[in-house]
Amino acid sequence: MATKIRLQRHGRKGYAFYHIVIADSRAPRNGNFIERIGFYNPNTNPATINLKFERALYWLNVGAQPTDTARNILSCEGIFLKKHLLEGINKGVLSEADAKSKFEAWKNVKRIAIQNEINKIYEQQRIVNKAKLESERVVNQTKTKVLAQKEKLLKEENNTPLPSE
């Protein structure tokens, strides 16, 4: 049976999220699947990916073909790198310790890059919020000045005697 690793659409209109599933290649997009191996939410920044690493690696090793988007997701999670390193171990090119250290180094670099991206997003959000707060403060100050002037004018009108008829 030809199996595919692909995305199954869920969510509402305009806010889709996806389950990463193993399915028969002839099954419809949201039809029956063999196994659900993960979750992908592109609506968050950065996108949220939750994946059963060992199961995805197993299905790749037994011949499941990922779709283009699923391939990108698996690649971002390091599954193709792990598969490549395991093939190197089987051929005798790499030792298991070397493969493990290379994978851990890649994982740490990836984790740092993601954390830097998150920090950059938070910093931009903080700057935007600070600018909004400052503009709101200026608007409130001008409003209070205008109200003070109006109150002053009303007091002056009340203090002046009315013209007699």
Swiss-Prot record:
Tagged with keyword Ribosomal protein: yes
GO cellular component: cytoplasm; small ribosomal subunit
Keyword set includes NADP: no
Cysteine disulfide partners in this protein: none
Pfam families on file: Ribosomal_S16
UniProt GO molecular function: structural constituent of ribosome
Keywords: Ribonucleoprotein, Ribosomal protein
Ranges that cross the membrane: none
A Gene Ontology biological process term: translation
Similarity comment: Belongs to the bacterial ribosomal protein bS16 family.
Native organism taxonomy: Bacteria, Pseudomonadati, Bacteroidota, Bacteroidia, Bacteroidales
PANTHER family membership: 30S RIBOSOMAL PROTEIN S16 (PTHR12919), SMALL RIBOSOMAL SUBUNIT PROTEIN BS16M (PTHR12919:SF20)
InterPro entries linked to this entry: Ribosomal_bS16, Ribosomal_bS16_dom_sf
Protein name as it appears in the record: Small ribosomal subunit protein bS16
HAMAP family listed in its UniProt record: Ribosomal_bS16 (MF_00385)
